[in-house]
Amino acid sequence: MRPDRPRDPVTGPDEGPESPYPIRMSGPVIKGFGRGSKELGIPTANIPADELSQHPELSVGVYYGVVALDPARFSTGETVLPAVLSIGYNPFYKNESKSIEIHIMPPLSAPSPTATTSTDGQVTFHKLPDFYGTPLNLLILGYIRPEYDYISSEALIEDIRVDCEVARRSLQRPAYRCYLDARAVEDPACGGDDCGIVVDAIDGGAMRGMRFCI
């Protein structure tokens, strides 16, 4: 069950990601359980969980990072976007298989908050078009919290809303913000020459030249 205490507003050291982060994963967007959008109103992009066997350091829980979308297939104005992701079994739904569910957020330049709450208490999250099959590169930059069971879907939705704001504030710090820069420009906040080009191109090289800090 979720602890009844205030949440930290940011997570991870201000100086930037510390070991084992950043962790890179990739894969095509696949169909998940279909509950994120339909039942919770929180669209997610699922990628295969196969790579988790290569990352024993990733325990079940909620993380934040950035995703790089293939600009040849997906146009949002920006192709590197902040993200919150869940790795695990989602105790509320009692899943039997481990999954990677990624909620892609608006650019940091977009007005906060990521999710809005109406006068009647309805929470609405940022939505993106369906893009099943689209290659997706994921860079995990930090850990937010363990996964919890919940007494209601409303409690789950509220925690995800807070997760999004924690991720957003965490990524707004200079040592993290540069991970969202896909342009071939060095950012001193990322350590200058330590900002390197992603060499593992996907989809025939469509992502070649996307710049992440490593």
Curated annotation (Swiss-Prot):
Cofactor(s) for this UniProt protein: Zn(2+); Mg(2+)
Enzyme class: transferase
Gene Ontology molecular function: ATP binding; metal ion binding; riboflavin kinase activity
Example GO biological process: riboflavin biosynthetic process
Pfam families recorded: Flavokinase (PF01687)
Domain of life: Eukaryota
Cellular compartments per GO CC: mitochondrion
Catalytic reaction list: riboflavin + ATP = FMN + ADP + H(+)
Pathway, per record: Cofactor biosynthesis; FMN biosynthesis; FMN from riboflavin (ATP route): step 1/1
Enzyme Commission number(s): 2.7.1.26
Binding sites annotated in the UniProt record for Mg(2+): 44, 46
Cofactor note: Zinc or magnesium.
Gene3D superfamilies (alphabetical): Riboflavin kinase-like
Keyword Kinase included in the entry's annotation: yes
Region (Disordered): 1-27
Active site residues per record: 101 (nucleophile)
InterPro entries hit by this protein: Riboflavin_kinase, Riboflavin_kinase_bac/euk, Riboflavin_kinase_dom_sf
Alphabetical keyword list: ATP-binding, Flavoprotein, FMN, Kinase, Magnesium, Metal-binding, Nucleotide-binding, Transferase, Zinc
Family note: Belongs to the flavokinase family.
Functional description taken from the UniProt entry: Catalyzes the phosphorylation of riboflavin (vitamin B2) to form flavin mononucleotide (FMN) coenzyme.
Protein's name according to its UniProt entry: Riboflavin kinase
